């Protein structure tokens, strides 16, 4: 699972180190890299495992081939996705297109989202986070809590 937030800088060759815990999780899934694509929800880069992008692809494929929504999702996600392999030091090279989308210049935040993570320009993420916390507070009653405990833990 991808948890926490880490800040890393782009080196002179345009590479950035992916946090060790994120690389470890991807490696445990049998993948030595990450799939990245520009978010269509916000000004970030979406990042996920090979398995996750295959699930997204299957979800898109489940739509009728003649449905416009299928083309919208395939174009916005699959055609924009990049398969980035880690080098020997756990770094990736994000394309200029991805960096421009997120307005990243020298430093970026790797933001854990559970099964995925996002890559943000730090100041943009801080603004987003403030708004997200407000909206989470307003919508907290809609978060479902399944009881997974035999004793009364987690109530």
Curated annotation (Swiss-Prot):
InterPro entries: MraZ, MraZ_C, MraZ_dom, MraZ_N, MraZ_sf, SpoVT-AbrB_dom, SpoVT-AbrB_sf. GO terms for molecular function: DNA-binding transcription factor activity; transcription cis-regulatory region binding. It comes from the Bacteria. Pfam families: MraZ (PF02381). GO terms for cellular component: cytoplasm; nucleoid. The keyword Iron-sulfur does not apply. Residues 5-52, 81-124 form the SpoVT-AbrB domain. It is found in: Cytoplasm, Nucleoid. Keywords: Cytoplasm, DNA-binding, Repeat, Transcription, Transcription regulation. GO terms for biological process: negative regulation of DNA-templated transcription initiation. PANTHER family: TRANSCRIPTIONAL REGULATOR MRAZ. Belongs to the MraZ family. Forms oligomers. This is Transcriptional regulator MraZ. It comes from Pelagibacter ubique (strain HTCC1062).
């Amino acid at each position: 699972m991808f948890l926490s937030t880490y800040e890393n800088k782009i080196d002179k060759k345009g590479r950035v180190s992916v946090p060790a815990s994120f690389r470890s999780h991807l490696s445990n899934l049998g993948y030595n890299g990450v799939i990245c694509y520009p978010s269509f929800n916000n000004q970030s880069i979406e990042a996920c495992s090979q398995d996750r992008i295959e699930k997204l692809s299957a979800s898109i494929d489940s739509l009728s081939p003649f449905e416009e929504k299928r083309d919208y999702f395939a174009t916005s996600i699959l055609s924009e996705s990049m398969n980035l392999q880690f080098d020997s030091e756990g770094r990736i090279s994000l394309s200029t297109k991805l960096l421009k989308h997120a307005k990243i210049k020298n430093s970026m935040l790797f933001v854990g989202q559970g099964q995925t993570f996002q890559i943000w320009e730090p100041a943009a993420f801080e603004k987003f986070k403030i708004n997200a916390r407000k909206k989470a507070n307003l919508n907290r009653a809609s978060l479902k809590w399944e009881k997974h405990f035999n004793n009364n833990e987690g109530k």
